Amino acid sequence: MKLLLFITIAYLLGSIPTGLWIGQYFYHINLREHGSGNTGTTNTFRILGVKAGTATLAIDMFKGTLSILLPIIFGMTSISSIAIGFFAVLGHTFPIFANFKGGKAVATSAGVLLGFAPLYLFFLASIFVLVLYLFSMISLASVVSAIVGVLSVLTFPAIHFLLPNYDYFLTFIVILLAFIIIIRHKDNISRIKHHTENLIPWGLNLSKQVPKK
């Protein structure tokens, strides 16, 4: 019964459409009608600015972190916290409060890893920043980080210093999270192949793609 309760709470937390609500209530802007149409962190930064984007990133990460801490807070250590966190990501991606049309799972997945293995998140975040600097594409950085995440958990225990609290669900959950992230970025991947993906004004842009005006 408690397991079902934790899953429900995690899903509902994840379902809070942070960027969408911030846009509607503070800026009177519907993110779905601007930019990529996505309600996640990247489009929030692009359309609403740094303050709204930062708030969206922080809250979306917090949803994942809080969800993974639920079993610990209530003393149910027999329940896999990483598995509970997965349902927050599921809620973020398919939110009941926003017609099941949500973000691309990156920020909330990061929040889940922050609560489970902060050093491991730092490792993947370093990969994210490196790829972002080299190619100036948030989408590419997200996809590459997801792939590296899968490869790294498959090499455990070689990276035990990054995952001291390894959970037997971790490999399975990370693969699921990576799958969701990659699938949610399928349109971005297509644009990357055709050199039409959105760029940020930072980094080397090694693909030499011409930024959109």
Swiss-Prot record:
Its main location: membrane. The keyword Ribosomal protein does not apply. Pathway: Lipid metabolism; phospholipid metabolism. One of its GO terms (cellular component) is plasma membrane. It catalyses: an acyl phosphate + sn-glycerol 3-phosphate = a 1-acyl-sn-glycero-3-phosphate + phosphate. The chain crosses the membrane at residues 3-23, 68-88, 112-132, 134-154, 163-183. It is found in: Cell membrane. HAMAP family: PlsY. Probably interacts with PlsX. This is Glycerol-3-phosphate acyltransferase. The gene is plsY.
